Amino acid sequence: MGDREEIARFYDRGSDLMRELLEALAAAPEQLRTFPEVEDILAWPRRRIASVVGGVWHLRMTEFGGRRPYRFMDEDRSASGRWEIWVDTIQADAIRGAQGD
């Protein structure tokens, strides 16, 4: 997902936890981090990211054609050997803009 308006709409439609996750990712664009690293930053229990991301599946599929305003790298391709998550600079700018709306 790269359209600013679409990202802002996703931000608005997501849960408080999804917004918190997006804000944390937008604070460090282009920085790939494992789920536990992000969960530590947010002081979340383990596996919360999986729950939050899974919780917006229906929203993503029905309103956004499956697109998401964040990126994944699976464990087979990541340097850490674990799933990693991040946002690019365009996504981060759109998320920060949506925070102010």
Q: Model regions: which residues?
A:
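Short helix-capping/hinge SLiMs at alpha-helix to coil transitions
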Residues: 26-31
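Phospho-regulated, low-complexity intrinsically disordered regions of nuclear gene-regulatory
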Residues: 72-101
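Short, Lys/Arg-enriched N-terminal segment that forms or immediately precedes the first helix
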Residues: 1-12
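Short amphipathic alpha-helical interaction segments
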Residues: 45-67
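Short helix-coil-helix linker/hinge
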Residues: 12-20
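A short acidic, leucine-rich amphipathic alpha-helix
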Residues: 34-40
